[in-house]
Amino acid sequence: LIGGVTASLPVFTGGQIVYGNKLAKVNEEVSRLKHRQSENEVRLTVEQYFWQVVMLKEKLRTLSTVQEQLKEIHKDVDAAVAAGVTDRNDLLQVQLRKNETQSSYISVENALNVSRNLLGQYIGHMADSIDVAVTMDGSLPNRPDELYQSPEASLASTSEYHLLGKQVDVSHLKYKMTVGKNLPTVAIGGGYMYDNLMDHSHPFWIGSVTVSVPLTKWWSGSHDIKQQRLKVRNSENQMADQRQLLIIKMQNTWNAVTDAYKQVEIAIESIGQASENLRLQKDYYQAGTCTMSDLLEAQSLY
């Protein structure tokens, strides 16, 4: 009767175990970064739907103001036609403009309903159960210059840049693991043996040290190492390229923000000028020194 139990423990595997554990940790960090990136994308989409609703509601409010103005103009022109001061052509021009405004109002109202439905669907609510209560008071927030940070300094706060760095870390670890697969491995072992021959029992302990040299893998292994080294270089080059693209993207976004702020400044100034122009054109029309086309043009600019 012969029996026994043996066990072995790897002492050196070319770093495969160590680098494998590090690779697992890096993959966990990648998962967290992707999760954060997804959250940011969801927030951005919700904000886009939100401000789309706000914009359309402001358009409706503007069109309502225009409709009230046209209603007053129509009333005045109708009275002028009845008094024989002007002809019906002016009245028809006002009526056509009223129809155009009503058509625009219907289109914007439909677009608002669609945008509200999209917002509700995205956040998991029925469209008729949500509304956006934001009123634009015509004032500007603080200048965006107060929030400016250079794109280079902002890279560290972006998930995209961190993901690029993790991809480089993964390629380095995989390269080291590939090298480790072609290095000798050392393992220690021990066991307990028992034999009973010719009615003589003979139990004993054994110990061993095993060194394995992957001779048959040297050729294919060297090819794998070269291939993995190229992947490391590719990941580093990709990170450098994507870094520049991220900087350009952030700079373009900043330019869009500053341009939009300047456009709003110009628009606020233009509102006052257009309001005064409309008032003057009304006076000129009533005095008979301008045409209905001039008055309607001033009204459309307002």
What are these language model-derived features?
Residues 73, 100-106, 110, 192, ...:
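Outer-membrane beta-barrel domain signature
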Residues 17, 87, 157, 221-224, ...:
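Short, conserved glycine- and acidic-residue-centered signature motifs
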Residues 1, 8-41, 162, 181-207, ...:
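Small/polar (Gly/Ser/Thr/Ala-rich) solvent-exposed segments
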Residues 140-193:
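Acidic, glycine-rich loop-and-beta core segments that form the ion-binding/anion-interacting portion
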Residues 3, 49, 205-207, 253:
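Hydrophobic core residues within well-ordered beta-strands of beta-rich domains
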Residues 38, 42-61, 79, 115, ...:
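Amphipathic alpha-helical coiled-coil segments
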Residues 41-155, 253-256, 260, 302:
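Periplasmic alpha-helical coiled-coil/stalk elements that build and connect Gram-negative outer-membrane
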